[in-house]
């Protein structure tokens, strides 16, 4: 089998035991300022996105339907790929080294599973979802969006930086199809209350009932699949979950 350049680069930082990249080569601050003028390459419109470079096995009828916003080190993204092998999932991460880690992690997983074509349905891009989401997705394209353990921006002056706010909720509604779901999880109760307040006040969302939330097959995976979620479990912290439907 011929490996591509990204797979070859990933091998230089991988563990000899697991065959996966090691986080110690990708350390970075826990959060990044989403308002700062980072340097990003981004498409002018969704039609300009080269999805085939991210999903080598994509066919002409397929499109990305799941988006993990602020995907961190990719633990939950990998879980999505395993749970929904016929769906394309994208992770969007603003931090350079962290997004590099996820890209290398996916390359290593694809290489390890080259005989089964597993993990061909997940990918990660470095971008600022608070600014460029409509550049990547068409109207009503997405079925599910995930906001797991977002930066709480504790200071009141920085609340405007929170990834859930009234203006951005309208953008999310634009790229979400009717009936699509927004999954939110945090270990900060104040942020959870903020999210619930803003989303229930927005006319295009309704919160799922407790019964519907528990019945969703993704719900159990939200607690420990991501690295941040697993850390909260280890520290015996609280999880605050809310799922909303696009109406």
From Swiss-Prot:
One of its GO terms (molecular function) is tRNA (guanine(46)-N7)-methyltransferase activity. This is tRNA (guanine-N(7)-)-methyltransferase. Its main location: nucleus. It is an enzyme of class 2 (transferase). Its EC number is 2.1.1.33. Gene3D superfamilies: Vaccinia Virus protein VP39. Pfam families: Methyltransf_4. One of its GO terms (cellular component) is tRNA methyltransferase complex. Pathway: tRNA modification; N(7)-methylguanine-tRNA biosynthesis. Belongs to the class I-like SAM-binding methyltransferase superfamily. TrmB family. It comes from the Eukaryota. Coiled coil: none annotated. Keywords: Methyltransferase, Nucleus, RNA-binding, S-adenosyl-L-methionine, Transferase, tRNA processing, tRNA-binding. S-adenosyl-L-methionine binds at residues 70, 93-94, 128-129, 148, 226-228. HAMAP family: tRNA_methyltr_TrmB_euk. It comes from Drosophila grimshawi (Hawaiian fruit fly). Catalyzes the formation of N(7)-methylguanine at position 46 (m7G46) in tRNA.
